[in-house]
């Protein structure tokens, strides 16, 4: 089922992206920023863990109806319809992306999460690194801030 909503000059599509991309003209928009699925874990039974936490709290059940890892035709279509692209997780796909890379250092220390995320960026021919803390609830605009208390008005005023 295809649904479309218009908000000013922004159009939101709720449909299979391949159907939408095939219908679009070449260079339809200036920049595509995407983070496609890169592994099939959510399709596997029990991927999201046990039905109860170690404390006995019941976890919500999220049914995964469709989780498809894109093939090369997705990237071909995406590059056809967009003038520039930023594609997160480019290191997981067998596609001949150009040289430009963005490396996000998540400043997450010793955790089970990846230390970095890598994106292809067609706007550059080099590698750019930026650090932005992301480790579950520890998020920040500055590495020096450490854990951010979301309701901390004084800290938010200092940022402005």
Residue map of PLM features:
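A conditional alpha-helix N-cap/helix-loop micro-motif detector
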Residues: 13-14, 67-71
């Amino acid at each position: 089922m295809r649904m479309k909503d218009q908000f000013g000059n922004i159009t939101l599509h709720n449909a299979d992206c391949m159907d939408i991309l095939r219908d679009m003209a070449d260079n339809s928009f200036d920049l595509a920023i995407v983070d496609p699925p890169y592994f099939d874990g959510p399709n596997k039974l029990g991927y999201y863990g046990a039905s109860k936490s170690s404390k006995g709290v019941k976890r919500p059940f999220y049914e995964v109806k469709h989780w498809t890892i894109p093939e090369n035709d997705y990237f071909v279509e995406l590059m056809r319809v967009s003038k520039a692209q930023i594609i997160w997780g480019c290191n997981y796909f067998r596609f001949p992306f150009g040289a430009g890379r963005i490396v996000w250092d998540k400043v997450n220390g010793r955790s089970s999460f990846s230390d970095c995320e890598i994106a292809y960026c067609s706007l550059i021919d080099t590698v750019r690194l930026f650090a932005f803390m992301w480790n579950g609830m520890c998020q920040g605009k500055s590495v020096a801030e450490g854990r951010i208390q979301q309701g901390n008005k004084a800290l938010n005023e200092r940022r402005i």
